[in-house]
């Protein structure tokens, strides 16, 4: 026996059709990417998706121009240089590489993912926690936003903050700790 539904429960159930519900594939893919890269805000994923779509559209329009066109040569070189500097394409080869730029490409350049790649964290969840707690700096600036995109040139400058306990433990483990530097 099932109890009679209350008024507000009936009103809510009128909006839902349990017999003809649809599963959208892009939503499942979106959830998979959100979980894999530990994105905390869905807006980040939609922004990355819009950017990747704009890059692919721009590359398609540049490919439609004649090959000898000076504007095509300059614009495609500038686009490929920008994408290579951001780390979204592996080489500055051709415009066909722009077709492989996706939202996941942007997610791979986020600071926690770069920390994982540099083996500064064992798990992505720990890397996100390190960034949020202020243990990581990029160049001279402390970064507390996990959505920070790290370029190829800045990847070498990702390090621990000087006052971080994690840096102290790493230096002690490697027997490189200098008491004079850490006390200041």
Swiss-Prot record:
Q: Which GO-annotated molecular functions does the record name? A: RNA binding; rRNA binding; snoRNA binding
Keywords on record: Nucleus, Ribonucleoprotein, Ribosome biogenesis, RNA-binding, rRNA processing, rRNA-binding
Coiled-coil ranges from the UniProt annotation = none
Q: Which pairs of Cys residues are joined through disulfide bonds in the record? A: none
Q: Which PROSITE patterns does this entry report, sorted A to Z?
A: S4 (PS50889)
The family note in this entry says:
Belongs to the universal ribosomal protein uS4 family.
Q: What is annotated about its quaternary structure and interactions? A: Part of the small subunit (SSU) processome, composed of more than 70 proteins and the RNA chaperone small nucleolar RNA (snoRNA) U3. Component of a heterotrimeric complex containing IMP3, IMP4 and MPHOSPH10. Interacts with MPHOSPH10.
Q: What is this protein called?
A: U3 small nucleolar ribonucleoprotein protein IMP3
Write down the species.
Answer: Homo sapiens
Q: Lineage in the entry?
A: Eukaryota, Metazoa, Chordata, Craniata, Vertebrata
